Amino acid sequence: MRISSLHTYPVKGCHRLDHDAARVEPWGLAGDRRWMIVDPDGVGITQRQAPVLTGLHAVPRPGGLVLNGFDVAEPEDGPKETLRVFSAKPPLTARLAPAATAFVSDFLGRPARLAWLADTSVRPIATHAQPGDRVSFADGYPLLLTSTASLDAVNDWLLEAGDEPVPMTRFRPNVVITGAPAWAEDDWLGHRIRLGGTTFRAAKSCSRCVVTTVDQETGEVGRQPLRALGRHRRYDAGLLFGINLIPDIAPGETEVIRVGESSLALS
């Protein structure tokens, strides 16, 4: 098994960045979802509500990022705000970037603000984690791993149903592996996985939502692959595709993983 691709999403819900190599921090890949657009109530806005976010291209730079050509500095002295990634999630404190308010509001066509997670220690992982595990603005876990063979299985179901196959981008993974049998990742839960020279804990399966129906290049919304997952991959935990990982590295440490490196499920 090998790593076939690596991806980050600098702003939650935005278009992906593809990488040949990525630095692993305790809370995920470097630069992944440290920013989030929120509504006036401080709740995150994602592609669930705003598929237009597929057209938001965010590129990190030292001390900030560039959004579709609009430069935003990290608001180190920006106002602190109590936010929620989802309305039902616990609150956390992050800083707002007032200079970006007009830009993100115009982009979405609704009132919105841009938040930056300066301190990753403020958001603990709720379940299937160890004390001290933290996550950025990702849904719940630092990384999502998917398998090309499992995608092939989904696309076989789609073709049988008379639908077009979908690319892996629909599932917005961080790490994609090749060389494992379809659904082998189901058996890795509760174990450790080594990607290159870095070890991760396989925390839980990933329950999928309507974002999988959003074309990540056009923002158009359809019905698949969520309908196929509902028919073939429905479990008590939801409609499952991919697994959530937690880096098994100490606070303050970083490591690097690269496309082409081997991957191995450990005992």
Name these PLM-found stretches:
Residues 1-267:
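Metal-cofactor-dependent catalytic cores
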